[in-house]
Amino acid sequence: MDRIRIRGGHPLAGEIAIGGAKNAALPVMACGLLTDDRLVLNNVPRLADIGTMKALIEQHGIAVERLDPLGRILSLGGQITNTEAPYDIVRKMRASVLVLGPLLARCGEARVSLPGGCAIGTRPVDMHLKGLEQMGAVITLESGYIDARVQGRLRGADIVLPMPSVGATENLLMAASLADGITTLRNAAREPEIEDLAHCLISMGAKIEGIGTGELRIEGVKHLHGAEHSIIPDRIETGSYACAAAITGGRLLLRNARLDHLGAVARTLREAGVEIEEQDSGLLVSRRNGLHGVDVMTEPYPGFPTDMQAQYMVLMSVAEGASMVTETIFENRFMHVPELNRMGARINVHGASAIVRGVSQLSGAPVMATDLRASLSLILAGLAAEGETIVNRVYHLDRGYESVAEKLSACGADIERISG
């Protein structure tokens, strides 16, 4: 099993190209199920989750081709021949449930395995199902599968989400694009990835109003056509490498990064002492003086994203003073804390909050990655630590970060990925 070795203490300097956003690419790939025509996607990241979605789309009969040597341009096209999304694929990635809405809207039926670890009623997947039921779908749960059917077309509906779930907004937005009548999604998620999906759907012929707001109005059409669409830059990758520049006292140009997508991340980092300068080619991130503790609470966009919580906590672990990090989106998302404490951090968890008392220096240690964002947080800690850090179980990284060791090494980090 691969691991990453880091010898810390080297300020980063150079440029890192920010890739396409995984969380935008996955739902946009699902749009390939909404038309027989060809959908061409540019700036697609090369990640394990993209490969999983590719396999799932192909399972339904849609051909997915890579049009360039690096695989960043995908072509999707063909007729749906199968409406079942099997457990063997869906278990690998929660976002696999995004095929439910398109399959149901297009074919009138879908059988999709419940995503791994999903408990109906306590996880956001129930919002997908209730919204589709309001649009006329009949849904049953049996043997770990969602069975959904509708007579004729889905019908437009006025849907109020109990919370601004990103996945539910995406699924219902795609389904409503082919529904009969007008659908209003209230308390919809507002993330840039939702905007990107809406723009792709509009380029395919969908009629959507309210993009970027909490209320989306979708006038369903009978058919969508092919299009070409470019995936937006990954704001979480941007924030992660901004933390890398700050924690090492370095200076990085993050090419293609967009300040308008960072929202609360940029504001919070600046308040903590990180300098972020917008340039034509991206964002220049540096730190000239010390960091100081700033409290943060994760919230739906435009609030501070839960996917940046672990990385920010590492930054606070070497900041002057104390800070409180409160997680409101997901339960049990502090699994990186014991590993950071092994490296000398002083973090105490109290329910949904973690109290972080900054230390002057972290120490290298063998640590275990527990999930995607925790993996990157441990790498950040290793970059700042004195001595050698070994991060185990780094396969999590491949789901959301492309060539991390290579990108950081090119900017002066002493880091390598070790196989076996």
Curated annotation (Swiss-Prot):
EC annotation from Swiss-Prot or TrEMBL: 2.5.1.7
Gene3D superfamilies listed in its UniProt record: Enolpyruvate transferase domain (3.65.10.10)
Pfam families given in the database record: EPSP_synthase (PF00275)
InterPro entries the record matches: Enolpyruvate_Tfrase_dom, Enolpyruvate_Tfrase_sf, MurA_subfamily, RNA3'P_cycl/enolpyr_Trfase_a/b, UDP_GlcNAc_COvinyl_MurA
Binding sites annotated in the UniProt record for UDP-N-acetyl-alpha-D-glucosamine: R94, D307, I329
Catalytic activity: phosphoenolpyruvate + UDP-N-acetyl-alpha-D-glucosamine = UDP-N-acetyl-3-O-(1-carboxyvinyl)-alpha-D-glucosamine + phosphate
First-listed, main subcellular location of the protein, grouped into a coarse class: cytoplasm
Protein localization: Cytoplasm
Pathway membership: Cell wall biogenesis; peptidoglycan biosynthesis
Record GO terms (molecular function): UDP-N-acetylglucosamine 1-carboxyvinyltransferase activity
Database matches in CDD domains: UdpNAET (cd01555)
Residues the record lists as binding phosphoenolpyruvate: K22, N23
UniProt KW keywords: Cell cycle, Cell division, Cell shape, Cell wall biogenesis/degradation, Cytoplasm, Peptidoglycan synthesis, Pyruvate, Transferase
Modified residues (2-(S-cysteinyl)pyruvic acid O-phosphothioketal): C118
GO CC terms, sorted: cytoplasm
Similarity field: Belongs to the EPSP synthase family. MurA subfamily.
Entry annotation: catalytic residues: C118
GO biological process terms, semicolon-separated: cell division; cell wall organization; peptidoglycan biosynthetic process; regulation of cell shape; UDP-N-acetylgalactosamine biosynthetic process
Name of the protein in question: UDP-N-acetylglucosamine 1-carboxyvinyltransferase
HAMAP family from the UniProt entry: MurA
Role noted for this protein: Cell wall formation. Adds enolpyruvyl to UDP-N-acetylglucosamine.
